């Protein structure tokens, strides 16, 4: 783990983002989604910050993540929505973790685990409304609801929630979202006819929370917006603040002649006499190799572009006639307050999404936390 590079995480920004999203949710509860190590920000600190900002639920992909939150002393409701075979269901039930049921086979697994735990399982039925990924499809909604109703009547589980996930919410005018919401209402009707009465119905991710009031239901699940990044490129959300700033101290700087090849494969060749600054971060830290000759970096008070191939541990920036000294700082991305690039700028440069940019920053880069909530 390096001391010369850091991902500085503003926990007050996370809390403030949740508070802002709660206002936009207009009465719906807010689930802070902290899967994938809190989108690279650190799961436990992000969870605490989200709760401090007004989240009443936490969301993870896997049971192991939820158990880590419990081990950290967090007792808020947690939903783990992706349950592969072999997961520690009994341990999850003992820990009071809500489980997402997205396949028919999982129902029997959870019932068996509840018997072993001698405790009611808390489950959320996931219905597939058109994403065609996880979730029980329309042909099996009635059978799933009936099976859950029988298990609930037997005292083995309680159906805490019903949920789904949207495919195209980041395209506000895409009719697929309306079609999925209509399908979700149909699924809720099936659940109601089976005699189930879930506490929370939820389908809205960050994009739907911000653009589709009809998708909010009882609970919303902001993911990327929790961390201050817009779920829709080009959509400005006043008040959202990016929480992560990725930076490193420069290792050195050298003057080179025109025509000098830079880094592996000489994919960048200088066209003049110039200064090259060396940044000690690379694809071993989550900086994509695809950032070669494409991604922006803030060095010596200006935005530059990575020059040459991104290596495992380092990359080069052409700074022209400007000068730097070892120990000066290069900022890869941050809130943009001082002219530095943002994670969205990186996403635009690499033809990807900001989610990937922040989530892929590796464990070799220490997280340094600021803010009142720790």
Curated annotation (Swiss-Prot):
Entry's EC annotation: 5.1.1.1
Residue numbers binding substrate: 133, 312
Active-site positions on this chain: 35 (proton acceptor), 264 (proton acceptor)
GO CC field: cytosol
Involved pathway(s): Amino-acid biosynthesis; D-alanine biosynthesis; D-alanine from L-alanine: step 1/1
Gene Ontology terms describing biological process: D-alanine biosynthetic process; peptidoglycan biosynthetic process
N6-(pyridoxal phosphate)lysine: residues bearing it: 35
Keyword presence, Isomerase: yes
Catalysis performed (reactions): L-alanine = D-alanine
Keywords of this entry: Isomerase, Pyridoxal phosphate
UniProt KW Isomerase keyword: yes
Domain of life according to the entry: Bacteria
Enzyme class: isomerase
Cofactor(s) needed for function: pyridoxal 5'-phosphate
GO molecular function per UniProt: alanine racemase activity; pyridoxal phosphate binding
InterPro entries assigned to the protein according to its UniProt record, in alphabetical order: Ala_racemase, Ala_racemase/Decarboxylase_C, Ala_racemase_C, Ala_racemase_N, Ala_racemase_pyridoxalP-BS, PLP-binding_barrel
Intrachain S-S bonds: none
Function as written in the Swiss-Prot or TrEMBL entry: Catalyzes the interconversion of L-alanine and D-alanine. May also act on other amino acids.
Protein family membership: Belongs to the alanine racemase family.
Alphabetical list of NCBIfam families matching this protein: alr
Name of the protein described by the UniProt record: Alanine racemase
Upper classification of the organism: Bacteria, Bacillati, Actinomycetota, Actinomycetes, Streptosporangiales
């Amino acid at each position: 783990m390096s001391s010369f590079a850091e991902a500085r995480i503003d926990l007050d920004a996370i809390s403030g983002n949740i508070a802002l999203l709660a206002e936009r949710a207009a009465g719906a509860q807010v689930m802070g989604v902290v899967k994938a190590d809190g989108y690279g920000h650190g799961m436990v600190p992000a969870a605490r910050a989200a709760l401090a900002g007004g989240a009443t639920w936490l969301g993870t992909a896997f049971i192991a993540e939820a158990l880590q939150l419990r081990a950290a002393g967090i007792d808020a409701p947690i939903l783990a929505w992706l349950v592969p075979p072999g997961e520690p269901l009994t341990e999850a039930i003992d820990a009071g973790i809500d489980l997402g049921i997205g396949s028919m086979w999982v129902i029997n697994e959870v019932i068996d685990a509840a018997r072993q735990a001698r405790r009611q399982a808390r489950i959320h039925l996931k219905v597939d409304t058109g994403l065609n990924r996880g979730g029980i499809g329309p042909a099996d909604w009635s059978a799933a609801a009936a099976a859950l109703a029988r298990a609930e009547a037997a005292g083995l589980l309680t159906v805490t929630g019903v949920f789904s996930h949207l495919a195209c919410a980041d395209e506000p005018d895409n009719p697929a979202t309306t079609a999925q919401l209509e399908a979700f209402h149909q699924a809720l009707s099936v659940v109601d006819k089976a005699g189930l009465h879930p506490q929370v119905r939820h389908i809205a991710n960050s994009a739907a929370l911000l653009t589709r009031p009809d998708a909010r239901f009882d609970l919303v699940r902001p993911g990327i917006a929790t961390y201050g990044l817009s779920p829709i490129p080009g959509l400005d959300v006043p008040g959202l603040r990016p929480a992560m700033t990725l930076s490193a101290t420069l290792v050195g700087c050298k003057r080179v002649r025109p025509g000098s090849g830079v880094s592996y494969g000489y994919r960048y060749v200088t066209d003049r006499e110039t200064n090259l600054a060396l940044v000690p971060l690379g694809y071993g830290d989550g900086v994509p190799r695809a950032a070669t000759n494409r991604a922006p970096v803030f060095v010596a008070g200006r935005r530059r572009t990575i020059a040459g191939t991104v290596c495992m541990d380092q990359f080069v920036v052409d700074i022209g006639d400007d000068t730097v000294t070892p120990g000066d700082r290069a900022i890869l991305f941050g809130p943009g307050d001082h002219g530095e690039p943002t994670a969205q700028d990186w996403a635009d440069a690499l033809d990807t999404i900001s989610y990937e940019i922040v989530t892929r920053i590796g464990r070799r880069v220490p997280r340094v936390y600021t803010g009142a909530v720790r």
